[in-house]
Amino acid sequence: MQQLTSSPLWRNWFIALAAGGVLVNLLGLHSSILEPDGALYAGIAKRMAESGDWINLYAHNRDWLDKPHFPFWMTAASYSVFGINAIAYKLPALFFWAMGGWYTYRLARRLYSEPVAQVALLIYLTALHLVISNNDVRAEPYLTGLFAGAVYHWRCSKGWHGWWIGALFMAAAIMTKGIFILIPVVAGFLLHWWINGQLKEALTNPGWWFALGLTGLFILPELICLYLQFDRHPEKLVFGRTGVSGIRFFFWDSQFGRFLNTGPIKGKGDPFFFLHTLLWAFLPWSILLYSSLADRLRALFRREKGEWVLTGISLSCFLLFSASRFQLPHYMNIVFPFFAILTANWLCQLKTGEKWLNRFSRVQMGISLLLLAGCVGLWALMYATNFRPLVYLLAMTAGWILLWTRSAKFGVGQLQRLILSTSLAACTLYGFLNIYFYPAILRYQSGEQAAGWLNQHRKGEAIYTINPYSYSLDFYSAAPVLYTERANLLAIAKKKPVLLYTSRQQMDSLLSEKAAVDVIDSFAHYPISKLKIGFLLPHKRPRYLDYRYLLEVRSE
């Protein structure tokens, strides 16, 4: 740890790379909203802001029961201030992500030291899946910040204000993802108290029961909304049946139902899913993370007294999500602040010249080179005739080489070099993705392109859509987007011509049913969330593209 405090230049390097980490995340603000989930959530919040109805959630022009309300409230509030646009959608999520970074720093500083806090913040800012989630915005940035804030106040704040602030953050987190997230927090604190012989004292502390009671009180807005939209109206058709309870779904079906695969939304679980997912999701720090967790497991088996809250929360999340039958890579984002702190604390204990630091320095150098080479490879695949991305990559790579080979002249020690060079390589990759890569591929989000055409040429005219739907069309269109079925559309077309956005297959079906169809325009389409190497190659891309059509439909 002395390596980080002894250099007078360390703080300057830290500030520069922390600013770079923030910047590359902010660069995602100018990108379009990704389909399907991001654009779906943006559209739900759009309807909330436009209608002034902050109680009911709707998608596809029908009642929607899946995620809780908190992210939609924050997004709708942002729309009310900044207008309905992609930046306004992403801004509140970025605020909560930044809050997660702030609490990562504060938590590490309180539990360990200032150098550990600085390294933890750099790891947090440059962890791959956090950067991806700030571009493909869903609920995770909100949850990450709220989760870290709740744990900080319950672990470190003194007095009753810590209990109620932590309860407020935890309640907001529950109203973002569900009651299930309370389990790893409780498990983490129980482990800490048990190992340190404080279990009886903690369980008889009225503050903890006060905090849990306040958490239950603070989630009442969510329960009231669910009751008003669903429990009060058992006649509503949800998940193909009536009598669906929103409150039951919130407490059981959306959480334990997914875990046990008994709810309306099902998946296929793999107990090793997150073991290999973290290898790429926590890049470029994943190897160091696994090493730090192995060290914590050894200490756990020895029952060493000390700080165990973060380890307990992290391991319980890992085990719970691994046992679940419904799994997605971004589920682990919520413990990335704690992963960052554990990794930083373990890393700062390595000493200059010892074999493990030498080995991990070589590992991180290899990972950094792979990241830089990956950027150049993407440029060669996609931009071989455009040299602006290459100039950016060469300049950043030159800086990385200079830092690695001339570190002593910059007052940078071995551990500092490992941390700074890894962070710089990660920032290079993320800058390339947000400046060049995402804007290029998002041109093939056909719904957004169709909405742009409609806003310019047929402004204010409602457009119908039949499956497959486009959530980006719904969000970016200034006019209403009406979801319907083919039979209903033909009935409407008998009265007046209608605008329709749809696929080639649906267009052919309409023609087979003797409808009069005029093609107004067509738009190249590719599901951006399911990238394949062939799509990235310009000469192979046409064979991967589908097309969506703007049609005027009349009944003959």
PLM features: residue spans?
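Membrane-interface transmembrane helices that cradle and orient dolichyl/undecaprenyl
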Residues: 109-111, 150-163, 173, 347-350
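Short acidic/glycine- and proline-prone juxtamembrane loop motifs at membrane-interface regions
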Residues: 129-142
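Transmembrane-lumen/periplasm boundary regions of multi-pass, lipid-linked membrane glycan transferases
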Residues: 44, 157, 181-304, 309-346, ...
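Short hydrophobic alpha-helices at membrane interfaces in multi-pass membrane enzymes
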Residues: 120-121, 156-171, 312-314
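Membrane-interface alpha helices of multi-pass inner-membrane proteins
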Residues: 132, 163-177, 318-322
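Transmembrane-helix motifs of polytopic, lipid-linked glycan transferases
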Residues: 91-111
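Membrane-embedded architecture of ER/inner-membrane glycosylation machinery
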Residues: 2-5, 14, 160, 164, ...
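Specific aromatic-rich, kink-prone transmembrane helix
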Residues: 103, 142-158, 339-342
